[in-house]
C-alpha cells in the first residue's frame, strides 16, 4: 500500500501547490501549461476513483460498453468518459456511469463484452492511444462480439473546401448552430468581422475543433487499424438508429464501421 499512498500524496502536492509555486500571472503560456497539468492530475484521480466500479464488473459477461459517451448515457450499458456531460446517475438496472480516462485502456476482463460502441470519440485521441484502445477492445470482446464506430467523415469537409461548396457550410451551420453558435461564433481568437469570410476557417473548425481533434480517420485507415489489432471482419456500415441515435448532425456527417471478433 505504500506506493499507492506515495502516489496519492504526490498528486495532491501537484494539484494543490503547483499554482502557488508558479507566478502564473506573469505569463499566459505558463498558465496554459499549468491548466494542462492540472487536467492530467484530475484524470489520474478519476482513474483511481473508477477502480471500484471496474472491479465490480470483472466477473461480468455480455457487457455493452459506450466509450466516450459524453451526455449520451445509455440505459443498461456501461457508459465511460472522462466527463459525463449530463450528470446522469445509475438508477436504471444494469446502467453504469464511469468517469475514466480511456487513454489508460479498459480495465476489464478479457472476453467480457458482447458489444462495444463509440461515436465521435476516437478522433479525440492521439493515434498511439487510439490503436491501444482498439487493441484492448478486441481483448475485451467475447468471440463473435461486435465493435461499432461512428466517426466524422472528414472527406465531406475536404470535398466541400476543394469544390468551394458554400451550401455545404451553410447547411452544417444551420444544424450545428445550437451547439456551436451561428457562423461558428466560437472560432477562438478570430475578430468578429472576419468570421465566415474564408472557407478555410470553417475547415479549421471541421478538422481541428479547437485542438480537440487529434487524429483524422477515414474508412481505409480505420479499417487497417482494426485489422492490425486482430479484428478479422471489418465492414462499412450505414446509420443505424437503434445504435447511432437520431441526432441530425451525426447522421449527415459520420461514417460507420463495425468489426467482429
Model segments located where?
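Non-catalytic N-terminal targeting/anchoring module and adjacent flexible stem/linker
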Residues: 1-65, 137, 232, 238, ...
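S-adenosyl-L-methionine-dependent methyltransferase catalytic module, highlighting the catalytic core
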Residues: 129-142, 146-260
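Conserved SAM-binding loop
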Residues: 60-159, 220, 257-261
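N-terminal start-of-chain detector that recognizes signal peptides
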Residues: 36-39, 47-53, 69-70, 88-90, ...
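Short low-complexity stretches enriched in small and charged residues
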Residues: 29-36, 70-74, 212-218
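Short, flexible, glycine/charge-rich loop motifs used to bind or transfer phosphoryl groups or to couple energy/partner
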Residues: 53-55, 68, 87-88, 106, ...
